[in-house]
Amino acid sequence: MATVGSLKPLHHSSCSSSFPRNPIVNRKALLGFVFDSARKNQIRCENLRYSSESDGKRRNAAAKKRNQSPERCAAEGVLTGGGGSEAIAEVRTMMPERIKVVILTACMMCLCNADRVVMSVAVVPLADKLGWSSSFLGVVQSSFLWGYIFSSVIGGALVDRYGGKRVLAWGVALWSLATLLTPWAAAHSTLALLCVRAFFGLAEGVAMPSMTTLLSRWFPMDERASAVGISMAGFHMGNVVGLLLTPLMLSSIGISGPFILFASLGLLWVSTWSSGVTNNPQDSPFITRSELRLIQAGKPVQPSTISPKPNPSLRLLLSKLPTWAIIFANVTNNWGYFVLLSWMPVYFQTVFNVNLKQAAWFSALPWATMAISGYYAGAASDFLIRTGHSVTSVRKIMQSIGFMGPGLSLLCLNFAKSPSCAAVFMTIALSLSSFSQAGFLLNMQDIAPQYAGFLHGISNCAGTLAAIVSTIGTGYFVQWLGSFQAFLTVTAFLYFATTVFWLLFATGERVF
C-alpha cells in the first residue's frame, strides 16, 4: 500500500482529476497497474482530452447545473480517481492481468524444469544401486526426450488451434502424474522406468510452444522479450530448486520424496491456472479497458480476429533459410543445454570427486545466474527495439552473445583445476546462453506469428533429436575416453558454426 500527500489536480482531460506524482506510483501506472480509487469512481476511459484547466472546470460546472456528477477520466493507459482539488490520501494498486499471467507461466516453467532435474540428481544413487554403466546412464537420462520429440510438433499445432491455456493445463497434469509414478517405476523395472520417463517427456513437450504463443497474445511487442525472460527465469530457477531440494529429500525421505513433492505442486498449479487465465486478453473478465488498449497497441492484427487457417506445408516452411536458422539455433541450444543439465552433477562428482550434495550446490549456482541474466537479456532486447533498432539486428546481437559466450566458456572449462573454477566457467556459459531467449526463441513469432506454435514444434523436434544424441553421446565419450574434454570441445565448435549461420540468414521480418 502506498500513501501520497496532497496533490494538485491534473487538468489535461475533460475533467478535474488528481494523478499521483509519486515516481513509484507513476511507474506502476505506466505498466498498467489500476488504482483502487479509480474503480470506486467508475471512471470512463473514452473521454477526450482538453488542453486547459479552465476548459475542464467549465464543463464540470455545466454538468453540476444539469444535476450531473462531474466527469472523471482516464489518463492514457491508466485509470485515475478523485476529482477537483481533492487529494488522494491513499492509493492502492491492483496488479495488471498480464503480470498475473506471466507469473503463473514462470511458476509452470519452474515446475517443468524442476521435474526434469529431480531425475538428474536421483539417477546417481539409482545407478549405484542398480549397477548402471555410464553409457546406460545416458540412455536413462535421455528417455524423457523420446516422448518429448513427438509432442513438440503436435503440441505446437494444438496450441495454435486451441490456445495455450487448455493445452498447458493438460500437459502439467499429465507430467505431474508421470513424476509421481517415477519412483514406483524405478523400483519395478528398468523398462517401466524408461516408459514412464518417455510419457513424462510426451507431456512436457507442450510447455515451450504454449508459453511463447500465450505470452505473444498477452504482451505488446516492446514487452514481449521481458515477459519471455521472466518465464525463462522461472524455468532456470527450476534447476536451482530441483538441485538443492532433491539431495536433501533423498537423504531424509528417500527416492520417492522429491517426486511426490513436485508432482503435488504441479497439480496445485493446474487448479490455479484453470480458473484465472484466458487464451486472449480480450476474453478475460478481469482485465481493464486501459490495459487491453495497452496490450493491443502496436499489434496490427490480433490472434482472435484472424479466421483460423491451416498450418503451412512442411515443404513451404523448410524452403526458407530463416526457418533453418531457427532450427539450427534450436539444435545447438538444446545440444549444449541438455549436456549440462543431465551431466553437471555427474561431472562434478567424477572429475572433482565431490559428494552428491556438494555437486548439487556447484551445479545450482550456474542455473541461478542464468535465471537472472535471462531477464536482463529480455529487458535489453526490449530497450533496443524501443530506441529504434530493427528487430533483425536485435535478434542477431542477442543470439550471437547467446552462442559465442558459451562456446568460449566451454573451451576454458577444459582447463579448470578445481570445482570452484569449473563452476565459474559453467556460470558464465549458462548466463550468456540465456541471451538466446531474446534470439531464436522470439524469432518464431517474428517470422510466422500465425504459425509460431507449429514452427516451434518443428524446430524443437530437431532440437530434441540433438539433445538425445548429446545426452547419450556424452556417456559414450566419457566411457571410451575417460574424460569430458572431447565432448565439451565438440559442443563449443558447434556453437561457433551456428552463430555464423544465424548471422547470415536470420531475419526479424515476417516471412509466413
Swiss-Prot record:
Induction: Expressed with a circadian rhythm showing a peak during dark (under long day conditions). SUPFAM superfamilies: MFS general substrate transporter. The keyword Transmembrane helix applies. Keywords: Chloroplast, Membrane, Plastid, Transit peptide, Transmembrane, Transmembrane helix. Coiled coil: none annotated. It holds the Pfam family MFS_1. Its main location: plastid. GO terms for molecular function: phosphate transmembrane transporter activity. GO terms for cellular component: chloroplast membrane; plastid. Signal peptide: none annotated. Residues 1-44 form a transit peptide. It is a multi-pass membrane protein. InterPro entries: MFS, MFS_dom, MFS_Na/Anion_cotransporter, MFS_trans_sf, SLC17A9-like. Expressed in roots. The chain crosses the membrane at residues 102-124, 139-159, 167-187, 191-211, 228-248, 250-270, 324-344, 359-379, 396-416, 422-442, 462-482, 486-506. Gene3D superfamilies: MFS general substrate transporter like domains. It is found in: Plastid, Chloroplast membrane. Inorganic phosphate and probable anion transporter. Belongs to the major facilitator superfamily. Sodium/anion cotransporter (TC 2.A.1.14) family. This is Probable anion transporter 3, chloroplastic. The lineage of its organism: Eukaryota, Viridiplantae, Streptophyta, Embryophyta, Tracheophyta.
